[in-house]
Amino acid sequence: MSVTDKSKSRLSLVLVIGVFVVPVILAKLALTNQWFNEGVTNQGALLDQPLDLTELGVNTDAIDKQWLIIYGLPQTCDEKCDQTLFSINQSYLALGRETPRVTPVVMDPVGTHQALITRLNQQHWQIQASSLQAKLRVLPSQIYIADPLGNVMMIYPRPETEQQFKQFSKDLLSDMRKLLKYSRIG
């Protein structure tokens, strides 16, 4: 065997091994460095630390094993707060036949929003008073999703601009539809 034949056979061997090894190495690098987030379909942020409804001060006796959309009201409910409540309500109503499986919940800090609460009671909302413990855990102006087992699993920041409000409603509706579609509980 000549030198050129040996170098050709070695090159062929290296190429054959490379064809199988290089994609594995690239895939490992892509996963560890998070180059691709194409597999993520949720719009809200998943919570890193587990959070229980009792830690938020939610009275679970008033809610019968349903999915919850929880909104922590700020101290003063301005126009953005009203628009957030409207967006949550519209997303809730857009669920259609799935609405009996979902309950929107408002966490009211020390009962300060009576006029707002009387308006919401007509729309199938649960109003819960926030305790001091809940105030420490619930960020005001944040929207949470909780499963029927009482685990808070997803969080959304309150939108600030008109475009963000439109996107927020679509995102919340999309996530709720997926959760309800694949849920075997509640």
Locate the predicted segments by residue.
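Short extracytoplasmic/periplasmic juxtamembrane "stem" segments immediately C-terminal to an N-terminal membrane anchor
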Residues: 41-59
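Conserved helix-turn-beta segment immediately C-terminal to the redox Cys motif
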Residues: 85-105
